[in-house]
A protein has these predicted regions:
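Conserved beta-strand/loop scaffold segments within soluble protein domains that form the structured core
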Residues: 1-170
Length: 170
């Protein structure tokens, strides 16, 4: 509803011994003057495969805030697509990931700035250790200074991505 605030928790966990495949999809719409805080925790065993897609559309002066923690899965992938569809829409995307042991974690963010005065902030941090692998990519489309970022973390590398701000010219 217009001007409302909501908090949603997406918790994906399980024991280390169980073998599983998860394919999760979430489609959220943030209305005018509303704020949505989405908390996502991925903490599954080394024998799990977790593929997740989140689609978010943000209305006028609305804000979508993602707090993402990827702490475990044999293979984990997040595809996040955010559409800043109206003037002064905003997104704040923060997260951390730990790819240790033989885990492989992929994070792909795509932010479309489709209206004037939109704003997005991305702040992701990660660690890869052992034989663990982590992939992070960011595309901020339609922004006045759109940039593409791509980082690959290899064993024994600590990955600390600088935060980035993209704004659509008014």
């Amino acid at each position: 509803a217009r001007g409302s605030t909501a908090r949603i928790i997406l918790r994906h966990d399980g024991d280390d011994a169980a073998e599983r495949f998860v394919n999760a999809v979430a489609d959220v719409e943030v209305g005018a003057d509303a704020v949505l805080h989405l908390y996502r925790l991925l903490s599954q065993g080394d024998r799990s495969f977790h593929i997740e897609r989140i689609e978010a559309t943000v209305g006028q002066r609305g804000t979508f805030v993602l707090h993402d923690a990827q702490l475990g899965a044999g293979l984990g992938r997040l595809d996040l697509n955010v559409r800043l569809a109206a003037p002064q829409a905003a997104a704040e995307l923060t997260g951390l990931f730990l790819a240790d042991g033989s885990r492989h974690l992929d994070t792909h963010l795509h932010v479309d700035h489709l209206a004037v005065g939109t704003r997005s902030l991305q702040d992701y941090r990660g660690i890869a250790a052992g034989r663990g692998r982590a992939v992070f990519s960011l595309v901020a489309g339609s922004a006045s200074a759109a940039e593409v970022g791509y980082l690959v973390a290899r064993p024994y590398v600590t990955l600390a991505t600088p935060w980035a701000v993209f704004e659509q010219a008014t």
